[in-house]
């Protein structure tokens, strides 16, 4: 009996496919993402992407604007030349309704991990063109109110992602010039 359980356990472990980004299970309702968002926390598997204010993915997503073509315009702010600069990035729809192709510095894909539309959105930007894929995920909120339960959900959402070492930047504990 013990041998059977061990064999079954090994078969289950070996049969697990390569891990992809876990995503929200419900169908995405893109129009419900429209509006203002606030960066609450960031996580990355590559600290150089957000270690300093000028780091390439130290960005604050401030709004999402769905287009009639089911694309997604991402409005973000970042620190450049000693001031906060607004950038607009177009996310082009793909076969997967939760993934968008983007062209932004060191990221070529935006993925929506999870959302309830009214309170939070977990979104990741990543570079899928390099052998070691760099990724930055954000916990976005509709209002600037701390919610420990959602923060724990964010941590659970990015933990199973590829790469074992993650760096978490909790924005409620620091001053950020481009966080509105």
UniProtKB/Swiss-Prot annotation:
Presence of keyword Transferase: no
Span of the signal peptide: 1-18
Keywords for this protein: Disulfide bond, Glycoprotein, Secreted, Signal
Gene3D superfamilies: 2.40.128.20
A Pfam family matched in the record: Lipocalin
Gene Ontology molecular function: small molecule binding
Lineage: superkingdom: Eukaryota
Xref: InterPro entries: Blactoglobulin, Calycin, Lipocalin, Lipocalin_CS, Lipocln_cytosolic_FA-bd_dom
Cystine connections: 84-178, 124-137
Single GO BP term: positive regulation of granulocyte macrophage colony-stimulating factor production
Post-translational modification: Four distinct glycoforms A, C, F and S arise from different N-linked oligosaccharide chains at amino acid residues Asn-46 and Asn-81. Glycodelin-A and -F are taken up by the cumulus cells in which partial deglycosylation takes place to produce glycodelin-C.
Localisation: Secreted
GO CC list: extracellular region
Tissue specificity statement from the Swiss-Prot or TrEMBL entry: This protein is, the main protein synthesized and secreted in the endometrium from mid-luteal phase of the menstrual cycle and during the first semester of pregnancy. Glycodelin-A is expressed in amniotic fluid, endometrium/decidua and maternal serum (at protein level). Glycodelin-F is expressed in follicular fluid, luteinized granulosa cells and the oviduct (at protein level). Glycodelin-S is expressed in seminal plasma and seminal vesicles (at protein level).
Residues carrying a glycan: 46, 81
Subunit structure: Homodimer.
Its biological purpose: Glycoprotein that regulates critical steps during fertilization and also has immunomonomodulatory effects. Four glycoforms, namely glycodelin-S, -A, -F and -C have been identified in reproductive tissues that differ in glycosylation and biological activity. Glycodelin-A has contraceptive and immunosuppressive activities. Glycodelin-C stimulates binding of spermatozoa to the zona pellucida. Glycodelin-F inhibits spermatozoa-zona pellucida binding and significantly suppresses progesterone-induced acrosome reaction of spermatozoa.
PANTHER family in alphabetical order: GLYCODELIN, LIPOCALIN
Family: Belongs to the calycin superfamily. Lipocalin family.
Protein name: Glycodelin
Organism of origin: Homo sapiens
Organism ancestry: Eukaryota, Metazoa, Chordata, Craniata, Vertebrata
């Amino acid at each position: 009996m013990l041998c059977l359980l061990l064999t079954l356990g090994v078969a289950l472990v070996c049969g697990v496919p390569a891990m992809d980004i876990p995503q929200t299970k419900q169908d995405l309702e893109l129009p419900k993402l429209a509006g203002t968002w606030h960066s609450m926390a960031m996580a990355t598997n590559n600290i150089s992407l957000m270690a300093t204010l000028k780091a390439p993915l130290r960005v604050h997503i401030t709004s999402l604007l769905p287009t009639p073509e089911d694309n997604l315009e991402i409005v973000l702010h970042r620190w450049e030349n000693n001031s906060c600069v607004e950038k607009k990035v177009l996310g082009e729809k793909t076969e997967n309704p939760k993934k968008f192709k983007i062209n932004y510095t060191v990221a070529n894909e935006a993925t929506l991990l999870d959302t309830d539309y009214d309170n939070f959105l977990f979104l990741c930007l990543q570079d899928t063109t390099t052998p070691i894929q760099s990724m930055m995920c954000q916990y976005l909120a509709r209002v600037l109110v701390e919610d420990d339960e959602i923060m724990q959900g964010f941590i659970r959402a990015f933990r199973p992602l590829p790469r074992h070492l993650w760096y978490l930047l909790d924005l409620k504990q620091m001053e950020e010039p481009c966080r509105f």
